């Protein structure tokens, strides 16, 4: 029987919280983020961008950056919007969501830029 490793994530320590599909993996570089955006587009999902303060990241509500990018297939345009959101909200977490029209749910959800915890 294998042992279960305790992950030291605590609500009292915002920098330790894990959120999103890839949060337990090492941070992704630009090339890996690009591949994930390409995958979202290839699946026909609609990208959406949200952001919030790190202290409130565990709550349900995040601020939506503009409207979801319905039908957007240009990966560079999606990456540019992610960067614009990060530049406008430098201390916030910025996440990319892939909305799946068929299942009417989120098909992907990942933090692209991590904010600084207070």
Curated annotation (Swiss-Prot):
Which keywords does UniProt give here?
Calvin cycle, Carbon dioxide fixation, Photosynthesis
Cited InterPro entries: RuBisCO_ssu, RuBisCO_ssu_dom, RuBisCO_ssu_sf
The record's listing under CDD domains reads: RuBisCO_small (cd03527)
Q: What does this protein do?
A: RuBisCO catalyzes two reactions: the carboxylation of D-ribulose 1,5-bisphosphate, the primary event in carbon dioxide fixation, as well as the oxidative fragmentation of the pentose substrate. Both reactions occur simultaneously and in competition at the same active site. Although the small subunit is not catalytic it is essential for maximal activity.
A further note on this protein reads: The basic functional RuBisCO is composed of a large chain homodimer in a 'head-to-tail' conformation. In form I RuBisCO this homodimer is arranged in a barrel-like tetramer with the small subunits forming a tetrameric 'cap' on each end of the 'barrel'.
- Its family? Belongs to the RuBisCO small chain family.
What's the protein name?
Ribulose bisphosphate carboxylase small subunit
Q: What is the lineage of its organism?
A: Bacteria, Pseudomonadati, Pseudomonadota, Alphaproteobacteria, Rhodobacterales
Q: What gene makes this protein?
A: cbbS
